Amino acid sequence: MRYSHLFGKTSKNAPSDADSPNARLLEQGGFVEHVMAGVYSWLPLGLSVLRKVEQIVREEMDALGGQEIFMPSLQPKEYWMATKRWDSVDVLFKLKSQTDKEYALGCTHEEVVTPLARKFIRSYKELPFAVYQINTKFRDELRAKSGVLRGREFRMKDMYSFHADQADLEAFYAKAIEAYLRVFKRCGLDVKVVQAGGGVFTDKITHEFQALTESGEDVLIVCSKCSFGQNSEIATLKEGDDCPDCGGKLVKAKGIEVGNIFDLGTKYSDAFDFDFMTEDGKQRRILMGCYGIGTSRLVGAVVEAYNDANGIV
């Protein structure tokens, strides 16, 4: 194709409202076009990059044993009421139809995948299993910013795993960490796995995957010698302390969260009465895990990590 026929062109001038390198460079380079705060059109060049990133993610999730599905973004209010998150998730977009029926635009899919899995899974013989999707999510961000890093509409891969016992969940969780690290390595990012809070997802300690960059929004406490790290929001240690794992010195760093994983326990299976039959014929609550990667955010993180005065490198 001739460049003159390419839909979307590079520009000599940076967008005046760009507040981060990825916002400036992706739009100036003809990869995306800003529609409104937190919302972008992906042009042919940008869509090609996004698809490559999502294919890397898809390959690693398939290798982990995930089965790809596609779930709706439009979700019934009653599902969110069942988990008591209708009023507790402050970024949830809420809609009302012409018949006054209320819906949510999904920022996550625990409320959909749990009753879906409950319909098909009955026995320990069908466990463990994992399903994932790559689709569009929505967040009613109070202040969307930083280009494609913090959007109101964005692309995401979310995987959900189902297990008979805690040991099996923890084994899969560990494999998911390794799969995620392979994804980010293939994307060329220096990523640190850090302990973090569970927010509205779980009361347990979770893990974030932080791409280390000075332009990152998150403040981290990390070891200069080993893999130990904590998000400062839940940090039990501070800069200058000794690392509990290796004794090295802890330092502050900035990062962009590009992925997260959660041990959900029985929070959602309790909400939807999701049991399975054990080998000895008893009913037991199923255990769940959740694993997310923001694929459009990942594109932005790569640009933040690989740019200079001349543009994207």
Region locations from a protein language model:
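TRNA-recognition modules of translation machinery and tRNA-sensing kinases, especially anticodon-binding
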Residues: 1-313
